[in-house]
Amino acid sequence: MQSTCLRALPWLMLLLLTACAGQPPLTDTTQDWDSQRAALAAMDAWTLRGKLALRTTDRSESASVIWQQSGSNADLRLSGPLGAGATRVSSNGRQLVVSQNGKADTFDISTPDAVAASTGWNLPVKALPYWVRGLPAPEPAPSMTTIDAGLMQRFEQAGWQVHYERYQTV
């Protein structure tokens, strides 16, 4: 049971990036959505540093996160207090490799059912890099979008609700 929980933890943390991650640099929050979307979509290299939290009815977890993205290559490092539970997630756009405790598991991103079968979590792996930047993924089309002052506030996509509480200029 503990091994299953440990394997699911990185996936849960990835999911929470959409709600807890700092947003990309913004210079003018009054930009209209079309120009904002174009600017965010053009970003193909970025680094995210922050903290995230997971709360369920029976437990809570927190982690520090560093996510480096360059084109389709991603490197995500998660760690708990004092570096405990260090996990590395890397991807080349086709495969996702999750390394923890000296063991690595590889998944084909194009078959999310394989990730779900292995981890128990049906995560939108391909959508996360878009969501972290404040964008809906290209497919499927989002529903129920809310845009305010040229910035995405919330949307629903592929059964997930994505909500941005605030943006930060850096």
State each model region's role.
Residues 16-19:
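C-terminal motif of bacterial Sec signal peptides marking the signal peptidase cleavage site
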Residues 135-170:
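Gly/Pro-enriched, hydrophobic low-complexity segments
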Residues 21-24:
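Bacterial signal peptide processing site
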Residues 44-52, 61-67, 72-78, 85-89, ...:
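One face of beta-strands
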Residues 27-55:
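Post-signal peptide N-terminal segment of mature Sec-exported envelope proteins
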Residues 73-124:
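An acidic-aromatic
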Residues 115-117, 121-134, 141:
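Long, charged/polar, surface-exposed segments that mediate recognition or autoinhibition
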Residues 1-11:
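Bacterial N-terminal signal peptides that target proteins for export
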